[in-house]
Amino acid sequence: MPQIKSAIKRVKTQNATNKRNASELSKLRTAIKKFKNAVETDSKEDVSKLHLEAVRALDKAASKGLIHKNKAARDKSRLTKLANK
């Protein structure tokens, strides 16, 4: 347990950031799972809408530093490949 005032504050902010990041990553994973489920069920109109949502979620995560920009690009490429099948 930290004793210094600034260290105590830092622990509080780290915990808040950790919760926020976990929530954002969960939203990202959910968007990707919804898209993949739509691809498996072959619902064309849902696929295009959910593809946009998944790509948007990846871009947001990359811009916030939750995932690396190259991982976002790789995942977007894979999702687009699935959408075009």
UniProtKB/Swiss-Prot annotation:
GO molecular function: small ribosomal subunit rRNA binding; structural constituent of ribosome
GO BP: any one term: translation
Compositionally biased tracts (Polar residues): 13-22
Keywords: Ribonucleoprotein, Ribosomal protein, RNA-binding, rRNA-binding
Matching InterPro entries: Ribosomal_bS20, Ribosomal_bS20_sf
Region listing for Disordered, in residue ranges: 1-22
Entry keyword annotation includes Ribonucleoprotein: yes
GO annotation, cellular component aspect: cytosol; small ribosomal subunit
Cited HAMAP family: Ribosomal_bS20 (MF_00500)
Family to which the UniProt record says this protein belongs: Belongs to the bacterial ribosomal protein bS20 family.
Primary role: Binds directly to 16S ribosomal RNA.
Name of the molecule in the record: Small ribosomal subunit protein bS20
Gene source species: Lactobacillus acidophilus (strain ATCC 700396 / NCK56 / N2 / NCFM)
